[in-house]
A protein has these predicted regions:
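Internal helix-loop-helix
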Residues: 46-143
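Extended amphipathic alpha-helical segments enriched in small hydrophobics
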Residues: 292-327
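A short, Trp-centered hydrophobic/proline-enriched beta-strand micro-motif
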Residues: 140-153
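Generic, well-ordered alpha-helical scaffold segments in large soluble proteins
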Residues: 37, 44, 135, 139, ...
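FAD-binding core of flavoproteins
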Residues: 150-296
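N-terminal-proximal low-complexity accessory segments that begin disordered
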Residues: 1-47
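Acidic, aromatic-enriched beta-alpha/helix-loop junctions
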Residues: 39-55, 210-216
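General beta-strand structural signal in soluble alpha/beta enzymes
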Residues: 20, 144-147, 179-181
């Protein structure tokens, strides 16, 4: 069955470790800092369940309907179908949800388009990506990602920081997988996501192989902690005065791994600085996620232009020559 908002809210009740204002949050989906934004995300899934033809397609492996953000287009018509679904979701937030579920899905889709590049570096890691993509698609998962390093001493590389595990890196490996320790950013929407993709959008140097990794884990994985920034939603005391921050504050966050174990079938890049760069730059990963972002920004601009036009109408200046030129 098509995933609904209720399904998504239930999936977030998983014991995840979320911290804000220096304290552990015991019930993040109902906390004053997050509850409205979480329900805005859930509303996306209610919308797709109510508009199945517009928003979903049948998974080629599970036979269930999932969001079209996971669809690998093979024709112009499918490209148009997928775009229309991205536009429809963006309009629900007027373009203000920057990390809605279709953003990271689009990134993974683009990386899958470049699967041969992964295969040239490591057939095993390529298979892990391919299998995970099918898993995420078939379960219609909401993913976030952390792809930049914590801001510490910017004059130094990751390996030159005072703490060698300030940046998330490999501590150990065994037959079952790898163990990682350290932090990554920005984790936007991590409170309302199911899983998180770790990767590197910033270049790494030779000798920094311990940081040259990409993997995905559930948010509720043992040892994974979400450290949220201050919440705008929590301090927005009037929906009338703060219509955006009361509903669409996705809360950026630092994500810290305290010796998190990652199974091999969830590791996409391992100790390979060249593949870390290629993951986004040589595949369609970066372009595909930016495609979704440009659609969202288009919707946002339409919304802002609509507000500007309405202000001009209310103020009685819509007929002024300089205003007419704008609209």
């Amino acid at each position: 069955m098509t995933k609904t908002g209720t399904d998504h809210l239930k999936s977030l009740d998983d014991g995840r470790e979320v911290f804000i204002n220096g304290e552990r949050v015991t019930d993040p989906i109902n906390h004053a800092a997050f509850k409205n934004a979480v329900r805005s995300a859930a509303g996306l899934y209610d919308f797709q369940a109510e508009n199945e033809e517009l928003m979903t397609f049948v998974s080629p492996t599970s036979g269930e309907r999932v969001n079209k953000c996971w669809m690998m287009p093979t024709s112009y018509e499918q490209l148009v179908e997928r775009r229309k679904s991205l536009v429809a979701w963006s309009r629900l937030s007027c373009g203000f949800m920057g990390r809605s579920p279709d953003h990271i899905a689009s990134s993974l889709l683009g990386q899958m388009m470049g699967l041969p590049i992964f295969e040239r570096h490591s057939p095993e890691r390529a298979k892990a990506l391919s299998d995970y993509y099918a898993f995420a698609r078939d379960n219609d998962l909401f993913l976030t990602y952390v792809i930049i390093n914590p801001q510490a001493n910017r004059s130094k590389e990751a390996s030159e920081q005072d703490d060698e595990f300030l940046v998330c890196g490999v501590v150990d490996e065994d037959a079952q997988g790898i163990t990682v320790r350290g932090a990554k950013m920005l984790g936007t929407s991590s409170i309302m996501a199911n899983e998180v993709l770790f990767a590197n959008i910033q270049p790494l140097q030779k000798g920094e192989e311990k940081y040259a990794i990409s993997f995905v884990v559930p948010i509720a994985t043992k040892g994974l902690r979400i450290l949220s920034r201050k919440s705008y939603e929590e301090h927005a005391n009037s929906e009338f005065d703060y219509p955006l921050s009361t509903h669409f504050d996705e809360n950026d966050a630092l994500i810290y791994c305290d010796d998190v174990h990652v199974p091999w079938d969830r590791v996409f890049v391992y100790r390979d600085t060249d593949m870390c760069r290629a993951q986004f730059q040589d595949t369609w990963g970066h372009s595909s996620q930016n495609y979704q972002a440009q659609i969202r920004l288009m919707v946002k601009l339409q919304f802002l232009m609509g507000i500007a036009k309405r202000i001009a109408e209310v103020n009685g200046i819509i007929g002024i020559a300089s205003v007419v030129l704008v609209f």
